[in-house]
């Protein structure tokens, strides 16, 4: 019995020595550390000390992590904006002062129109990246085609309908011109050119009757002085009409073109038959194509009602007015998003070497954290501390994708 007591004590000490040392680090504190890392930008982990674990609402531990991640993300956004704008503190400009300063400032509508301010608009599920491979469209020439029978009376007018592909209709039109060839005149003359928008026949008129079923809506009228005995190409600004067609494609039934001289002769070449080759009306467009293409988002996307426990991207709207930051002119709010969730060792990490190190020494590291793996900038129009209006682009303010790293 005397020898058994020291032997039993030795076994107990050996069991304590062989107990896994990483078990004490797991639990609520580790979860809080993961939430703090999720609030960082570009995978950087926050140096903020991990707070004490909050009580779990309705037995939902992931809800606690998620709420803590939201709070850390909002505080991180505030400090990042001030830091990236090189401001020591938020400019002390109230809403009343902003109202007084804005009318004295240069016209801001042009800046708001030219630059994309991410505000209340919904963000697409897939992030956009620059397309550096495909050719971009700059100029589009659309030749006149025959009109639909629904807008014809006794087979007239046959011209002109212009067809545009969906790709062109989703571009930004910088300039649109309609080109019409006018026949030569024997002597100088004044020509009255008019363009009428066509609409389908109504129930009151028929193809052979005089019920006036087809409605003409005048959209352009020009007075042209012709002095040359040779033919003349006349261009007409058509951008406004084109915008209307692109917004409502069903309203594009075509147009009718007339150019009458004093004797009533129509000088506009609108015939699509033989003898008028190369003289048909056409539309010239200068467009700015969106060079960004959609790419499949490899990270998980969740909403606030999701029960997902893995690393996921959640929606978060930043409201500058709620902050009391009236010095920001635009946007007043934007969708920032945040990362939250657990990262298990069994999942491959962002960098292969990280995964290998953790596999070789699983107890020797703090473990992977759910952090942003791709971020994008926002444009901002704001007052600085000298009450000057500044336009700038702030990088890394929108979480596009989350991952474990």
Curated annotation (Swiss-Prot):
Q: Which GO terms describe its cellular component?
A: extracellular space; protein-containing complex
Disulphide bonds in the chain: 302-312, 311-370, 339-402, 343-404
- Site keyed Cleavage: positions: 119-120, 296
Signal peptide stretch: 1-24
Swiss-Prot/TrEMBL GO biological process terms: activin receptor signaling pathway; amacrine cell differentiation; animal organ morphogenesis; anterior/posterior pattern specification; camera-type eye morphogenesis; cell population proliferation; metanephros development; negative regulation of amacrine cell differentiation
Q: Which positions correspond to the propeptide? A: 25-296
Q: Where in the cell is it found?
A: Secreted
One Gene Ontology MF term: growth factor activity
Under SUPFAM superfamilies, the record lists: Cystine-knot cytokines (SSF57501)
The subunit field of the Swiss-Prot or TrEMBL record says:
Homodimer; disulfide-linked. Interacts directly with ACVR2B. Interacts directly with ACVR2A. Interacts with ACVR1B, TGFBR1 and ACVR1C in an ACVR2B-dependent manner. Interacts with FST isoform 2/FS288.
Q: Could you say which protein family the record assigns here?
A: Belongs to the TGF-beta family.
Q: What does this protein do?
A: Secreted signal that acts globally to regulate anterior/posterior axial patterning during development. May play critical roles in patterning both mesodermal and neural tissues. It is required for proper vertebral patterning and orofacial development. Signals through activin receptors type-2, ACVR2A and ACVR2B, and activin receptors type-1, ACVR1B, ACVR1C and TGFBR1 leading to the phosphorylation of SMAD2 and SMAD3.
What is this protein's record name? Growth/differentiation factor 11
């Amino acid at each position: 019995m005397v020898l058994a007591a020291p032997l039993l004590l030795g076994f107990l000490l050996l069991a304590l020595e062989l107990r896994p040392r990483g078990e004490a680090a797991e639990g609520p504190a580790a979860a809080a550390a993961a939430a703090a890392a999720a609030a960082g930008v570009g995978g950087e982990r926050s140096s903020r000390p991990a707070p004490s674990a909050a009580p779990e609402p309705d037995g939902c531990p992931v809800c606690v992590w998620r709420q803590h991640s939201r709070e850390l993300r909002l505080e991180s956004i505030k400090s990042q904006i001030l830091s990236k704008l090189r401001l020591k503190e938020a400019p002390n400009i109230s809403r009343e002062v902003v109202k007084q300063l804005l009318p004295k400032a240069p016209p801001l509508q042009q800046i708001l129109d030219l630059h994309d301010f991410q505000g209340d608009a919904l963000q697409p599920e897939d992030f956009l990246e620059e397309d550096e491979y495909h050719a971009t469209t700059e100029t589009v020439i659309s030749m006149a085609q025959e009109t639909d029978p629904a807008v014809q009376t006794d087979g007239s007018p046959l011209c002109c309908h212009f067809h545009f592909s969906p790709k062109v209709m989703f571009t930004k039109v910088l300039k649109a011109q309609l080109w019409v060839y006018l026949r030569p005149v024997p002597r100088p003359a004044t020509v009255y050119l008019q363009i009428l928008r066509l609409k389908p026949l109504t129930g009151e008129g028929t193809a052979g009757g005089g019920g006036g079923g087809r409605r003409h809506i005048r959209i352009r009228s020009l007075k042209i002085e012709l002095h040359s005995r040779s033919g003349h190409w006349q261009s007409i600004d058509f951008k406004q009409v084109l915008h209307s067609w692109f917004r409502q494609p069903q309203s594009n039934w075509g147009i009718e073109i007339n150019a009458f001289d004093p004797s009533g002769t129509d000088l506009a070449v609108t015939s699509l038959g033989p003898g008028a080759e190369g003289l048909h009306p056409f539309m010239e467009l200068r467009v700015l194509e969106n060079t960004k293409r959609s790419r499949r988002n490899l990270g998980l996307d969740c909403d606030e009602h999701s029960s997902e426990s893995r690393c996921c991207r959640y929606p978060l709207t930043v409201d500058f007015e709620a902050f009391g930051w009236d010095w920001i002119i635009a946007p007043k709010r934007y969708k920032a998003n945040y990362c939250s969730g657990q990262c298990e060792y069994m999942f491959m990490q962002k960098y292969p070497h990280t995964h290998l190190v953790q596999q070789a020494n699983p107890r020797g590291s703090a473990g992977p954290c759910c952090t942003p793996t791709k971020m994008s900038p926002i444009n901002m129009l704001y007052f600085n501390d000298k009450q000057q209006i500044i336009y700038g682009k702030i990088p890394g303010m929108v979480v596009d994708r989350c991952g474990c790293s």
